[in-house]
Amino acid sequence: MTIYAFYIYSRKCECVFAHRWKPSDRNSMETLVSQLEQNSIEDDMEKLIFGVVFSLRNMVKKITADQDQFMSYTTSKYKLHFYETPTNLRLIFITNPKIDSLTHVLQQIYTTLYVEFVVKHPLYTHVPPSAEEGGINCEIFRITLDRFVRTLSCF
């Protein structure tokens, strides 16, 4: 498994959706412990990811004339893939560093999954991320996203 996480940030810089994939070969006790540890640092992780993306994107804007130059960055442990929509919605994948660019996949997720299952969904109501169960709380979007990502050759 080489895709670790997917995030959506609003134009107000708030994480409105997060989905993580965990390796399936761990035993249940290790999984439970890691989930408890992860829940305590989720909010900080989401803020740190956005801070890094925001800083790098601004630096790239100052260096280059093209506004859409920043698409990914790589460390020794992970690679971050970035796509920003015309409405300033930001989609991010965290993957294995050896994966090629997934910007086209992020665009596809936005146009086929997000627009269809969140924007056009007649029963979906937006809840601000600051609320207890805030952000994108649409189960059909989460399930379809999970199925779509699992079909990718890099998963």
Curated annotation (Swiss-Prot):
Q: Give the protein family.
A: Belongs to the TRAPP small subunits family. BET5 subfamily.
Instruction: State the organism's lineage.
Output: Eukaryota, Fungi, Dikarya, Ascomycota, Taphrinomycotina
Which keywords has UniProt assigned to this entry?
Endoplasmic reticulum, ER-Golgi transport, Golgi apparatus, Transport
GO biological process per UniProt: endoplasmic reticulum to Golgi vesicle-mediated transport; intra-Golgi vesicle-mediated transport; intracellular protein transport; macroautophagy
Q: What's this protein's name?
A: Transport protein particle subunit bet5
UniProt cross-references to InterPro entries, sorted A to Z: Longin-like_dom_sf, TRAPPC
Gene3D superfamilies given in the database record: 3.30.450.70
Q: Where in the cell is it found?
A: Golgi apparatus, cis-Golgi network; Endoplasmic reticulum
**Pfam family for this entry, one:** Sybindin
Write out the function statement from the record.
May play a role in vesicular transport from endoplasmic reticulum to Golgi.
GO cellular component terms given for this protein? cis-Golgi network; cytosol; endoplasmic reticulum; nucleus; TRAPP complex; TRAPPI protein complex; TRAPPII protein complex; TRAPPIII protein complex
Instruction: Give the gene that encodes this protein.
Output: bet5
Q: Does the keyword Transport apply?
A: yes
Q: Which residues form a coiled coil?
A: none
Primary site of residence: Golgi
Quaternary structure (record): Part of the multisubunit TRAPP (transport protein particle) complex composed of bet3, bet5, trs20, trs23, trs31, trs33, trs65, trs85, trs120 and trs130.
